[in-house]
Each structure stands twice: as C-alpha cells, then as structure tokens.
Amino acid sequence: RFLAGRQPGDTVNAAHFLTLLEQETEEAVEDAFAALEAKKLLLDISQLPVKHHQGQAALRLRQEAELAEQGMDVSGLSETDPLRLYLEEIAQIPLGEDEASLAEQAAQGREPAAEKLMNLGLHRVVEIAREYAGCGVLLMDLLQEGGLALWQAIGTEDYLARRDSVIRAAMARAVTLQARANGVGQKLRQAMEDYRAVDERLLSELGRNPTLEEIALEMHMTPEDADTVRRVLEDARMLQRATAPKEEEGPEEENQAVE
C-alpha cells in the first residue's frame, strides 16, 4: 500500500519508510527494499536525521562530509588512509573510452569490455558517493556498495541509462539501513506522536495554529528537527489520502446519508 501509485523514477521518503518498517522483521525489511528495486523507486534520505553518531565515528563522518564538499581532495588525509589510497587508485584510471560501445560488448558477454566498463564506472561511483558523504555511512562502505551495484548492472539492458540510479539506490539503502540500526525509525515514530499531541494542545490553548518554533520549543528540539518531523508527518498524511479506498455509494446509501 505504501508504494501504491508510485511510478518508476519516483522518490520515497526514507524517514517515513523507516517509521513503517520499525516493528517489521528483517525478512519484511528485505522484501520492502526488493519492492523498491522492482518498482525502480529511489529513497530520498534528505529528511533522515544524521546527528546520532558520537566519538570517532562522528568526527570521521564530518571529515568525510568536508572532503566531499572540497571535491574529494585527499591531501588532508594520512598517506596510509585506506580511503586516500583507494581514491588515488581510482584517479589513475584513464577516461576517454567509448562507454556505449563497451556496454554493447558487455551485454554480449565479453568479459574484457565488462572489466573496462567497471573501471570507468568507478569514477561515477566516487562522484555519486559525494552526495551521501557524512550521512551516517563511511565513504569506503558507500564506495563498496556503489561498486557492487555497478558490477551487477553491467551487461544488463539500458546499462548507461540505469547506472546512476542503481548506484544511488545502493547508497541510499546503506544509509537507510544504518539509520534503522541506530533506532532512527523508532525515534521518528515517537517524535511524530509527540508532534501531533503538542500541535493539538497548542491549537486549543492559543486558539490558532501554533508556529513551528512554538512546537519545537515545547518538544525541546531545534526548529530544524521539528521541521523534519513535520515533513514526515505531511508525507504520511498525503500518502494516507492518496491510498485511501474510494467508496462508491449507491442510491439507497445516498438517501440514508441525507437522512
């Protein structure tokens, strides 16, 4: 029902997706991701909270986010840093090959063409990983997920047209699963309930719709975090309206309704 009416290429709010899967089994979660892939839908992680890391992990994620903003300039990393070594290796792979021709050969089962296509595609994996840097998953893990998705896509129909979307899907999945492991879905679900309660109470007390800042103050969170909760709630309401069954009333039912 959550995916009803969605068209290939549409995005799905990852935060709302997580709240729906909070109490589901791992098997059900895998089925949900499989449904996303089958319908060619992409998770939008922009509303996922990413402030739940602490210590060295948080420092590294911030460092990698800055690295991505600076165009993956690895000069600030240790010379033995695995990420630096990997990115320097990718940078040495020459560009300029005819990817369309290679894709056609790979689709015919030619292994050398598939390997060349893979190496060329790794440049694109690095570029796309910049979009997800600092979102809860380390860059090396994002690059690994993106590389695996790239390899699985090589040789399939419309590879070049689908390449970026399958890489993004793999990285968005990794970020979403990490958020789930960190309990983001449960926290968001509770925050949604609290938001509704505070909104209704302030409406009654003030005699008007409360502002976002007033709700945030009552919930002891920043306006930015409250806005994230509000957006997830709005998405859930829109989905509920869009998927609600439309009941058709017969003449007899219409007369009863009037009475």
Go through each PLM region and give its residues:
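Short acidic, hydrophobic short linear motifs in intrinsically disordered regions
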Residues: 8-20, 210-213
